[in-house]
Curated annotation (Swiss-Prot):
Protein biosynthesis listed as a keyword: no
Name assigned to this protein: Izumo sperm-egg fusion protein 2
Keywords attached to this entry: Membrane, Signal, Transmembrane, Transmembrane helix
Cytoplasmic topological intervals: 207-220
């Protein structure tokens, strides 16, 4: 199927660079592939729904969780916590594979499946970030940690404050746009607002002058 091939290429499957966090666990990848093989063509009867389900599952096999971990958080997680997330993820995948839902209800369940996985992964990522960003205690933080970018186990390290918590949104902004663009957009918005205000004032002024001229003509 050409669409499926294009999606595979788009998601960059098959290379270690596409792995991250949950995908570092080969059993998670295997479970996702088996789920995709079991439901996409057999339980979705419309081509549009097949394409959406295929894209959703392939994104989870690809860099989706890695990008989330790196852009919204510092990209590291305690191994023990990640193993719990992975176990829950695989159990949910097996449940979806075994139930009898089809078409739209099944697609909705896949969306909920991904949302639940994000929620659980977020808890593990945030827990590590809170400990690594606490400079009073981070030096004594001991645990086996996984680097979600390289799929390598490492030791926890203190994280600079500029990379912690509220700055996570700033990291996401940097990924998708230059720093100057938001400022330029604000400037353009201000100029448009001022321009519209001036135009409105001129329209009112012209209308008032026209009214006075017409009134004078009527009174003559």
């Amino acid at each position: 199927m050409p669409l499926a091939l294009a999606l595979v290429l788009l998601c960059g499957l098959g290379g270690p660079g596409a792995w991250g966090c949950l995908q570092c666990d080969q059993s998670v990848l295997l479970e996702l592939r088996q789920l995709r093989d079991a439901i996409v063509t057999k339980r979705f009867h419309l081509e549009g729904l097949q394409a959406r389900a295929q894209a959703l599952l392939l994104s989870m096999e690809g860099p989706f969780f890695r990008d989330y971990a790196m852009n919204a958080f510092v990209g590291k997680v305690v191994v023990d916590q990640l193993e719990k997330v992975a176990t829950s993820f695989k159990n949910q995948a097996q449940y979806i594979k075994a139930n009898s839902k089809t078409d739209v209800p099944l697609l909705e369940e896949l969306v909920s499946f991904r949302e639940h996985a994000i929620k659980e992964l977020k808890g593990a990522l945030r827990d590590y970030e809170m400990k690594a960003c606490d400079h009073k205690t981070c030096h004594s933080f001991k645990a086996e940690v996984l680097d979600c970018l390289y799929c390598k186990k490492t030791m926890p390290k203190c994280v600079k404050k500029k990379y912690c918590f509220e700055d996570g949104q700033f990291r996401m902004t940097l990924k998708f746009q230059d720093d100057n663009k938001p400022r330029n957009m604000v400037l353009v918005g201000d100029l448009v607002t001022v321009g519209l205000a001036i135009l409105t004032f001129l329209v009112i002024l012209i209308a008032a002058c026209t009214y006075r001229q017409n009134r004078k003509l009527l009174l003559k």
